[in-house]
Every structure is written in C-alpha cells, then in structure tokens.
C-alpha cells in the first residue's frame, strides 16, 4: 500500500521550469520519514475537484499517436503541476488515487515524447513531495521501470528531471528496488555514471547524488541496502564530498550538491553500526565532515588533510597565506577598538528585540546570516585573529561581515550574498547532522581516538586557534548551526566518564613531557572555558538550551576529584540567572545543569562551598558578566530565590541552602510575570510554573538531598511538607517526584546514623525525635493513599521504596497503629498483580525484618517469610531477585535471634516454615545469578540455624543434603564471582553449626574438596579469601574428617600461600595481602588442631622446597597481624561473625602442645613430629629476633632525638 510521509523534497525549492534550485535539509530534530496520523480534514473544493476530474479524464484516455492526445496530456499535466498542494492540508487525497494517476499517465506517455516525459517527471516529483506519499510496490515497479527505460532511450537533456522523479519514487523504498539496482548502481549504472565527480553536467550530477541519498534511506521495518551496492553508494557520496567545486559552477548549486551528499551520508550511517571495511575509512569521512563544518564560515579558511588519524595529540590545521584586502574595504576596517568591542557583544543584547516573539525559522536564518558581527570569540584572547579582516582571504571573509549594515550593497548583490550565506550554513548544518550520525553508529572507544580533532586542549594564545566544535558554537552566525555543533559535542560527552577518568592535573606539571592525562585535563578545562563563553554570548533560546544541556553532559562525566578546583565556580555563578529566564526550555535546562552539579561525585568540596554561599544578587556580580541579565530579559519584581536567601533573611552560614529554597519556590509558588510563547501548562487562577520546570526542580532537590544532606537537613520538615503537597496533586509525574524526594530524605537520615560515632557526620545527626515527627507527618498525610492507588503502580512502587527508608530507631517510636498500618499495607502489596509493586513491597519487608523492634516478633517474621516465599516463585526475575535478597535478610535475622534471644525464638518458629524456606532457597540457588547470589547466602544462614531437633527429623534429611549439594555445585560452577564468593561464605557459615555431622557426612568430603580446589585455582582473589576463611571455620579436629582429608586441606592452603602472588589479572594484586593473611590464619588454625596421625603429611610439607617460603610468609603475617584488612573490607560483602584468633598465641600454644608429644607411646616415629617442631621453632626464633632488632633500632632513634 502507498503511504504518506514527510518528504525531503516537500520543502525543496524549484524554479517554474523544473530546474532544481536546491534542497533544504530537514531539521536536526525531525526525521524525513514520519508516518502521518492526522484526523481527516475538509479539502479545498477546487483541489479536490481538480484531482477527481484529472483522474477520471486520464482513466478515459488510451495510448495513441494522435496530436489531440498530446495536447490533452499537456493540459492535464499543467493543471496538476500548477496546483500548490503544500499550501493546505490534503490528507483526504488517497495515496492510492495518486499512484493510479501516475501509473496511468506513464502508460499514456511514450518514450518518444520527451517534452511530455519532462512534464510527467515533474508531476511525479511534485505530487509525491507535496502530498508526502511513499508509493506502493506496484507503482514503484511500474514507474521505476519507466524511468530506467527513459534514462536508456531519451536524450541526455531529459535525464536530470527523470532522475529527480526517480529520487522521489525510491525514497523509503530502497530495499524494494533490488531488481533495478544493477542498472542503477552496477559498474555501468546510470547513477554511478552521473554521480561521478568527473561528470561535467552539474545538474545531472546533483540529481544522481540526490537519488543515491534517497536510496540510502533505511526504514525501520525494511531491510537495508545490501552489498556491493551499499559500498558503491558510500564511495560516490564520499568522493562527492572530497571533490572541489568546478570553476564554472555556481556556488549555490554546488552547495545543494554538497547538501544532498551529506544527507545521503547521514542516511547511510543511520542504517546500522559502523563496520571497518577496506573501502570505508573513518578518518577520511571525519576529515571531510570537519571541512564542511566550517564551510563558508566567515573569517575561517582552512586546508584540511585528506584523512584524520586517531592520536592522543592534537592535530593542527594550516591557515593559508593572507592576501591583501581590496582598497574599497578600507573604511570598514578602520573602526575603533571600542566600536568593534561594542559590536561583538551584539548577540548578547542587540538581537533580543527583533527575535523576541518568534522561533529560529528559515526567515530568522536569513536575517541572522545577514546581520552584524555575532562572533562568539569576542570574549577570548584569540578574537583578533579570527575577526580581523586583514587576516582572512577575500573569498572566505566577505565584505558583509565587515560592514556596519547590508545597506551598502545594491539590492541584487545583497540578496545573493544573503542567499549564498544561507546555503553555506545549510551545508554546515548538514555536516554536523552527519557527524552526529557518526557519533551514534561508531563505538565510542574508536571515536575517542579522534578527540583532539574536534575538542580543543588549549585556547590557542599566540597562534591560530584550533578549529573544533567549540569554534562553531562560538563563531557561527546562525543559531541552528551553533545548536548543531553543541548537539554533536553533547553526544561525544555522553557516556564519556570512563574515557575522561584518566584526566589528572592535581600534581605539579612535568617539564620533560606532557602525559596524556594532563592533555586530557587541559582539554576538559578548555571545554569549560569555551562553553562558558558560549553561554554568555548566546542570545537564541533554542541554542542557549543546547549550551546548558552540553554543560550538563560535561559536568556529569568529568572527574573533578582528579582536577584542580575552580572549574565549577565560574559556571555556577553564570547559570544562576537562567533559572529565571523568559523561555521555559532554558529554565528547565539550567535546572538540569544544577542537578548535574550537585550529583556529580557528591559531595565535592567546591560545590559544598558554593551551596553555602548567600543567594543575594551581589554574588552574581563577580566573575564574567552575563549579557542577558537585563530588565528586558529577566523577571525583576519578585526574585524569590534572592528574597528567601538574602543576607538579611538567611540564618547565616547555617541557614537554608539557597538552591534548596529556590527549587521549593519553583515548585510551590505561582509565577508572577508572563513568559515567552514557548511556555505551556499552568493552572486556573494563579498559574504555577510549567510542569517541566517543577519536575526538574524536584529532581534537583532529590540530587541535593542525596549528595549534600547536611545542607538540606535544616529544612527537613519543610521538604516533607513539600513532598506531601506533591502527592496530593493530579499530575502523576509530580506525585512520583514527590515520593522520590521523600525516599532520598529517609535515606539521608539513615546514612547519618550508619556513620561512625566519632565522625563529623554523626555529630550533626538529625535528632530522633525530629525524625519521628517527620515520619509521623508523612505517614499521616497522602503517602498512605499513594500506596493504595492501584491506578498508578509506578507511584505505588516509589511509595514502597519510601516506606523502606524509615530510620529503624524512629520506626520503633511511631504509634503502634502506624507501625501495623505500614506492615499490613506492605504485606498486602506483595500480592499485587504488578510485578514492580510486588518487588518493591518484598524489598521493603526485607528492610523491615532487620529492624530491632520487629525481628524478635515471631508472628511478623513468619508472615514476612510466607510473603517472601510466595514471591520467590513469581514469574518475574526482578521479583524473585528482590525476594531472594529479602530472604537473605530474614535468615540474617534468624542468626541474630539465635544468638540474642536463644531457644525461646527457635522453639516458637515453625519447623514446617523453616523446611519450606530451606527448600525454596535450594530451588532459588539454581535460578539466575541475580537470584542465586542471595539464595546461597540464605542457605548458609539456614544451615547454621538448624538445631538438633530439626536434624533428628527424617523430613529434614533430604532437604539438608540437597542444600549442601547446591552450595557445593555453586562453589565449583561457572557463576559470577559474586555468586561464588557468597557460596564460599555460605559453606563457612554452615560449618559453624556444631550440630551438623561435618566430619562424617557424605557431603563433607565434597565440600572440603570444592573449597580446596577454589583456594588454589580461582582467578578471583576475593573468592580465594572466602574459601580459605571457610576452611578455617571448623572448631574441632573431628570436623575435618580422617587424616587424608585433613592433609588435603593442609596441602591446598600451603600451596595457595606459596603461589599467592601469581595472578593473570593485575587488579587482583590489591587483595594479595588479605589473601596471604587469611591463608596464614587458616594454616595456624589447622596446626593448632593437628593430631599425631596428621603429622606425616605436615612434616613432608614443611621440610621440602617450600619450607623457606612458608616460613617467610608466616613471619610476615605475625609481624603485620592486625594491620591487614580482612576480606570484604571494601564494604561490598558481609564480614564473618567470628573474630580471628591471635596468631602468635596460637603458634606458641601449638608449639607447646607438640613438644609434649615427644616420647609419647602413641608416636611410632618422632621424625615427622621433629620436622614440624623444627619448622615452628624456626618461625618463632626468627620472629623474636626480628622483633628484638626492631626494638633496638627504635631505641637508637629515640636516643638520637
């Protein structure tokens, strides 16, 4: 079926005789292929009648050679072509009717009638473009075949129009033209012939390139062009871009050729990920794109290399030799420095009045291109290099840029100059759109090799400035082009955190060479400087929005903790006024930037100081001035952020944070003054800020509370009331952001109470009574209604997360009915039909089960366990993962209760429920890794919790065996390292249960074997550490089984210690000391338990070649004991419940015990015992000598001092 689309040609410009004037590029934001789904409208009566009459007339005609038919067709074609279909809505014209008209017309026009063929092709192009139609397959087949025959048989003077019609036919249909591609793109294809840069006829060449561009367009539901035609198109497009302008070709015509080639390249790149093949060199493509980014840019002339090469060092372009200016331009060059400076700042204020009430449309493009000097370099030290007329060539620095107005031109000359500038700007814009497609389809790690070609690393003082994306953002006279360069820069910066993390300039600069980290840091500083200049100089609201978005991407990815402070302060001061800008998009973007500033690597000391500064207007006066801060641009009567945070109203340094007060006022208070036409939204009566502004302000508040809670805690109750107000509004998005803010407030309080008692953070804790007041007001407000709002499951999910952020100490002081209400609602939501709500409720119960006031309540623990077990069988992997995490927390509670409450809790807890938990955890240990990692943690706790009463029941026998088998298989398996780490920890946890038959059970041999294998062979040192810790858990010799099992464990630990520094991954070395310490503790533990039957294996181990290494490592462990952090000290995993034994005490007690065995009748031979004793005595003696030497050395040092 035929369909309607938004066509490239629909906004193209053509002359009356069919000659193409040029093609306007689609905007950067709008795809050319957009299906229309508009409501039906009444058609213009004359147009509808004309289409209907012409259609009926064509259907009544039959092919013949009569002159009357030719006359009739001429009249019909003239009528159809003369109608301006783009002037009104013609959605009611069925595409099928248009297709039938074109097919019937092609049957009536023989290939011998070339004048009629020209008109038919014009009609095809106009109807399809202006009515925005993609033809169906039948029409495509008929008309493409007709055009192909016409290209083969008709005179060459017709080919330009035929190709133009063909381009409209193949638009969006490239994948359906497979049978015609050999004739079009084969070795002797017509498009290959006419699209070649050597083609002398520029009209044919332009039409062919345009046709190739439309063939490259990929439609999501259809396959892309196949090889070798895909490569043929790329080659033609690239060669077109690399070619020079023929001397006899008009500049505007050449611009339209370039624009078609760039648009085709953009379509090509949108077809899929970039693949490095021999005939597609990324460096060559980037070179031409960079060249056309500056095409016709006033004051810029550059000779670009044919290929850009990836390199960390900057690549410099060469500036051609300067030619003298003509004499008639001398008066314009003699302006004073003061007048030039005044003129350079025109973008800041002068353009405000003219462009106040309209968008940056095409008319604005022309006026902007023909306006005065808008050079963004006016604030930089390099401005004189690019704005001085004496530096650039006459061709690329036209006189319009140097004159005070366009009135010095004659009308025709001025019109052509403006038109040329507009077409050149379109080329620059198309090049940037193409580069944006490159950024999206090429892997970032490859693209970052060309970073220095597009991002500056120095301001260029004393020489030509580097030509980069910032050059366009500051220099280009058209707002759309400036915005395009900022879009590309934003795309480059997005996701660049890992690349930029290597930047560093905190240390002293090196003189011998500049490392890449310093070069990258200089590039980051130059980006801050350049974008700040663009922010100050920009007057277009749309482009200003892009500047702020680009800055937000930059701030979100820069490693400020590795750079010298001072980058954020100038930026902070300049963006504050934009929160009150007249344009809503600017206000939203400025808040987004504030959100990035307070969330990046929080808390940053520099941002902390900026947040504590008073919010008076005087603070804005320091630094670089803001041109837009004028009475015409800003709302003056009620600057709420200034009133709320002024020095008179503020509470001193400890008063409310000015940014917090600003965001609260944006959410709650009505706007006092009208905004620009771009504002939308509001409410009846006193309108609030538009919804996007309020949502972004709430987002900033959430980031501020999360990163800088100490500054927000003074307004805790006020923020709680704000969140409650948001929850009562009708807008679901506002409700959701209000709930999110509540969650961040609760989390901030919990983080304060988790801090050590002796830290500054703990000293400024919110008092518990204030926390109780806060939650009492919140839970007495609309939060409960939000939890019960089944029509808004996303809000329910967020409200569950909010409930889970209540401070345990505060929860226990809430009224009993409030506690019961929270628990009841959460238990009920675990049976919700929405998986997100169910997952959030189960997670919240997993938090509550750790509360001291709830964990000893057997009924609550049982109800929570049943809810978790039900969720553990859910279809959703996310629900099962949250349920497994909660089950791990619940079993942690069982262990705590076993140690604190004792038998009373264990006797009251249901055996059947415990059995179900064991079975469910065993089943979950075979699930996805997200579920498995917590399931094995729960298994370890459950096996630790089992008592003799449970183990004596036959019903527990098989589940116990299956649980142990699951843990052993997980340790040996190929799961993620986190899962295996938890499995090793779980086995060690199970070994702590003295009631388990560890030494005699069938599974004990397999468990020790699995741990012994892991401790010697696992690549991950943290897994090795936990397996060594598990092997050292059993408290008695009987738990290790027979002497063969004991010797296997010993040999594995000794071998692991001897090879503890061998690893394939350099990152594992950070855990090397912890691994050696844990292995030494395990070996000493086994020595303390060894019996005479174990001595042969121990003696052979310590008397061989490994003896010196083992001795040295044990001595080192004894010396450093207590200094080496234990495994898991990075906070990612739970620590062992037991305290490590003192190594020196353990060693000396073992030595004394073994000496007592000498001469005992139980010993058949003292040789093995003497070997072990000799080894231990050497360790003790060498350690004591080392300590004595260290003591003497310390005494000498003290004596000298």
From Swiss-Prot:
Q: Is the Glycoprotein keyword given for this protein?
A: no
Q: Which cysteines are joined by disulfide bonds?
A: none
UniProt lists compositionally biased (Basic residues) regions at: 341-352
List where Polar residues composition bias occurs: 375-390, 618-633
Q: Name the InterPro entries on file.
A: ARM-like, ARM-type_fold, DUF4042, HEAT6
Q: Looking at the record's lineage, which domain of life comes first?
A: Eukaryota
Q: Which UniProt keywords apply?
A: Repeat
HEAT repeats mapped onto the chain: 182-221, 460-498, 523-560, 566-603
Q: Spell out the residue ranges making up region: Disordered.
A: 1-25, 321-390, 618-653
What's the protein here called?
HEAT repeat-containing protein 6
* Species classification: Eukaryota, Metazoa, Chordata, Craniata, Vertebrata
């Amino acid at each position: 079926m035929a369909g309607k689309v938004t066509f490239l040609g629909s906004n193209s410009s053509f002359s009356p005789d069919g000659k193409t004037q040029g093609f306007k590029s689609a905007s950067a934001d709008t795809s050319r292929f957009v299906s229309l789904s508009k409501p039906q409208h009444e058609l213009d009566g004359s147009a509808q009648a004309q289409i209907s009459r012409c259609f009926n007339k064509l259907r009544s005609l039959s092919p013949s050679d009569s002159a009357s038919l030719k006359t009739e067709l001429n009249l019909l074609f003239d009528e159809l072509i003369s109608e301006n279909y783009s002037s009104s809505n013609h959605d009611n014209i069925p595409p099928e009717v248009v297709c039938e008209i074109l097919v019937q017309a092609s049957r009536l026009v023989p290939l011998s009638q070339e004048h009629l063929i020209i008109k038919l092709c014009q009609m095809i192009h106009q109807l399809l473009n202006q009515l925005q139609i993609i033809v169906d397959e039948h029409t495509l087949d008929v008309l493409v075949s007709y055009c192909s025959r016409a290209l083969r048989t008709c005179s060459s003077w017709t080919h330009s129009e035929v190709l133009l019609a063909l381009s409209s036919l193949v638009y969006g249909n490239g994948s359906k033209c497979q049978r015609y591609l050999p004739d079009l793109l084969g070795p002797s294809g017509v498009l290959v012939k006419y699209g070649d840069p050597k083609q002398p006829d520029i009209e044919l060449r332009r039409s062919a390139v345009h046709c190739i561009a439309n063939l490259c367009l990929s439609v999501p539901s259809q396959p892309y062009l196949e090889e070798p035609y895909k490569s043929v198109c790329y080659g033609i497009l690239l060669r077109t871009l690399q070619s020079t302008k023929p001397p006899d070709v008009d500049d505007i015509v050449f611009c339209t050729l370039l624009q078609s080639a760039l648009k085709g390249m953009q379509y090509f790149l949108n077809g899929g990920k970039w693949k490095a093949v021999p005939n597609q060199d990324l460096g060559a493509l980037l070179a031409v794109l960079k060249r056309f980014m500056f095409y016709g840019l006033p004051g810029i002339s550059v000779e670009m290399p044919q290929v850009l090469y990836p390199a960390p060092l900057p690549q410099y372009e060469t500036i051609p030799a300067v030619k003298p200016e003509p004499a008639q331009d001398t008066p314009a060059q003699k302006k004073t420095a003061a007048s030039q400076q005044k003129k350079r700042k025109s973008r800041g204020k002068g353009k405000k009045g003219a462009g106040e009430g309209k968008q940056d449309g095409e008319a604005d493009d022309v006026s902007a291109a023909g306006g005065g000097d808008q050079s963004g370099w006016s604030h930089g030290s390099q401005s004189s290099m690019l704005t001085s007329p004496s530096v650039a060539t006459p061709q690329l620095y036209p006189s319009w840029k140097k004159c005070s107005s366009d009135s010095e031109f004659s009308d025709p000359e001025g019109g052509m100059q403006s038109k040329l500038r507009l077409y050149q700007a379109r080329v620059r814009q198309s090049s940037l759109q193409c580069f944006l497609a490159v950024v999206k389809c090429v892997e970032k790690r490859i693209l970052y090799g060309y970073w220095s070609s597009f991002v500056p690393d120095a301001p260029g003082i004393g020489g030509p400035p580097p030509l980069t994306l910032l050059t366009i953002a500051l220099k280009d006279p058209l707002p759309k082009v400036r915005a395009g360069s900022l879009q590309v820069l934003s795309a480059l910066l997005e996701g660049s955190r890992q690349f930029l993390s290597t930047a560093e300039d905190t240390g002293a600069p090196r003189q011998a060479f500049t490392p890449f980290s310093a070069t990258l840091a200089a590039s980051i500083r130059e980006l801050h400087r350049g974008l700040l200049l663009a922010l100050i100089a920009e007057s277009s609201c749309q482009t200003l929005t892009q500047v702020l978005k680009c800055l937000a991407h930059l701030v979100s990815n820069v490693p400020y903790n590795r750079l010298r402070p001072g980058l954020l302060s100038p930026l902070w001061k300049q963006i504050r006024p934009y929160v009150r800008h007249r344009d809503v998009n600017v206000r939203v973007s400025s808040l987004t930037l504030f959100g990035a500033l307070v969330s990046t690597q929080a808390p940053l000391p520099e941002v902390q100081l900026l947040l504590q500064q008073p919010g008076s207007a005087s603070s804005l006066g320091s630094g670089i001035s803001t041109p837009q801060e004028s009475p015409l641009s800003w709302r003056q009567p009620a600057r709420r952020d200034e009133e709320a945070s002024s020095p008179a109203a503020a509470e001193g340094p400890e008063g409310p944070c000015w940014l917090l007060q600003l965001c609260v006022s944006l959410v709650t208070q009505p706007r006092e003054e009208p905004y620009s036409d771009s504002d939308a939204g509001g409410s009846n009566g006193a309108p609030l800020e538009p919804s996007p502004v309020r949502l972004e302000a709430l987002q900033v508040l959430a980031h501020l509370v999360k990163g800088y809670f100490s500054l927000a805690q003074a307004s805790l109750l006020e923020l709680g009331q704000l969140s409650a107000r948001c929850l009562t509004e009708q807008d679901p998005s506002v409700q959701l952001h209000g709930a999110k803010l509540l969650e961040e407030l609760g989390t901030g309080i919990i983080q304060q109470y988790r801090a050590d008692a002796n830290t500054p953070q703990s000293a400024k804790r919110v008092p518990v009574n204030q926390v109780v007041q806060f939650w009492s007001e919140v839970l007495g407000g609309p939060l409960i209604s939000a939890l019960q709002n089944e029509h808004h499951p996303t809000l329910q999910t967020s409200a569950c997360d909010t409930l889970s952020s209540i401070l345990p100490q505060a929860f226990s002081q809430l009224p009993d009915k409030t506690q019961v209400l929270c628990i009841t609602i959460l238990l009920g939501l675990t049976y919700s039909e929405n998986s997100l709500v169910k997952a959030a409720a189960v997670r919240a119960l997993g938090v509550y089960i750790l509360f001291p006031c709830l964990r000893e309540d057997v009924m609550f623990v049982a109800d929570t366990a049943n809810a978790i077990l039900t969720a553990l069988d859910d279809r959703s992997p996310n629900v099962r993962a949250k349920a497994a995490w909660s089950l791990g927390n619940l079993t942690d509670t069982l262990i705590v209760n076993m140690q604190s409450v004792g038998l009373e809790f264990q006797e009251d807890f249901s055996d059947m429920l415990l059995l179900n938990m064991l079975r469910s955890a065993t089943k979950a240990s075979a699930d996805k890794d997200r579920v498995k990692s917590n399931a094995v943690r729960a298994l370890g706790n459950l096996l630790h919790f089992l008592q003799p009463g449970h183990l004596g029941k036959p019903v527990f026998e098989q589940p116990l065996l299956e649980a142990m088998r699951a843990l052993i298989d997980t340790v040996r398996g190929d799961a993620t390292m986190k899962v295996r780490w938890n499995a090793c920890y779980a086995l060690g946890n199970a070994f702590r249960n003295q009631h388990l038959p560890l030494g005699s059970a069938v599974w004990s041999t397999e468990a020790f074997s699995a741990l012994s294998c892991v401790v010697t062979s696992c690549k991950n040192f943290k897994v090795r550490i936990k397996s060594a810790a598990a092997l050292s858990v059993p408290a008695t010799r009987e738990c290790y089984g027979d002497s063969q099992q004991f010797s296997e464990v010993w040999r594995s630990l000794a071998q692991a210690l001897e090879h503890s520094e061998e690893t394939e991954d350099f990152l594992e070395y950070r855990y090397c000391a912890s691994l050696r310490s844990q292995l030494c503790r395990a070996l000493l533990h086994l020595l303390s338990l060894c019996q005479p039957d174990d001595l042969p294996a121990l003696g052979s181990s310590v008397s061989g070649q490994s003896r010196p290494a083992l001795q040295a490592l044990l001595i080192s462990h004894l010396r450093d004991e207590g200094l080496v952090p234990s495994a898991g000290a990075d906070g990612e995993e739970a620590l062992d419940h037991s305290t490590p034994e003192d190594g020196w005490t353990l060693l000396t007690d073992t030595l004394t015990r073994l000496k007592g065995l000498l001469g005992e009748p139980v010993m058949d031979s003292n040789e093995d015992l003497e070997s072990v004793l000799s080894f231990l005595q050497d360790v003790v003696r060498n350690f004591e000598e080392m300590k004595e030497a260290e003591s003497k050395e310390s005494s000498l040092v003290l004596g000298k001092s």
